[in-house]
Amino acid sequence: MVLRRLSRQASVKVRRSWTESKKTAQRLFVFVLELLLQFCEGEDTVDGKRKKPERLTEKPES
């Protein structure tokens, strides 16, 4: 009887900690995705202004 109760309490604690871990992991994942999106869009995080798009190859001026 006592062992059964302790087992149930332990499983509830594990479920709670797993739920908290999932929420933390989701928040971290969303943060990384937002950071990657800002980087891909070329937004400068220092002053919040967007940089002009840069070309990988320069066009020859005519």
UniProtKB/Swiss-Prot annotation:
The keyword Phosphoprotein applies. Pfam families: Polyoma_agno (PF01736). Its main location: host cell. One of its GO terms (molecular function) is DNA binding. Signal peptide: none annotated. Residues 41-62 are extracellular. It is found in: Host cytoplasm; Host nucleus membrane; Host rough endoplasmic reticulum membrane; Host cell membrane. It is a single-pass type II membrane protein. Phosphorylated by host kinase. Phosphorylation segregates agnoprotein in cytoplasm, whereas unphosphorylated agnoprotein migrate to the nucleus. The chain crosses the membrane at residues 24-40. One of its GO terms (biological process) is monoatomic ion transmembrane transport. Keywords: Host cell membrane, Host cytoplasm, Host endoplasmic reticulum, Host membrane, Host nucleus, Host-virus interaction, Ion channel, Ion transport, Membrane, Phosphoprotein, Signal-anchor, Transmembrane, Transmembrane helix, Transport, Viral ion channel. Residues 1-23 are cytoplasmic. Alters the structure of the nuclear envelope by interacting with host CBX5 and disrupting CBX5 association with LBR. Involved in the perinuclear-nuclear localization of the capsid protein VP1 during virion assembly and maturation. Plays an important role in the release of progeny virions from infected cells and in viral propagation, probably by acting as a viral ionic channel in the host plasma membrane. Allows influx of extracellular calcium ions in the host cell. May contribute to viral genome transcription and translation of viral late proteins. Homooligomer. Interacts with VP1. Interacts with large T antigen; this interaction may impact upon the activity of T-antigen on the control of viral gene transcription and replication. Interacts with small t antigen. Interacts with host CBX5; this interaction induces the dissociation of CBX5 from LBR, resulting in destabilization of the nuclear envelope. Belongs to the polyomaviruses agnoprotein family. This is Agnoprotein.
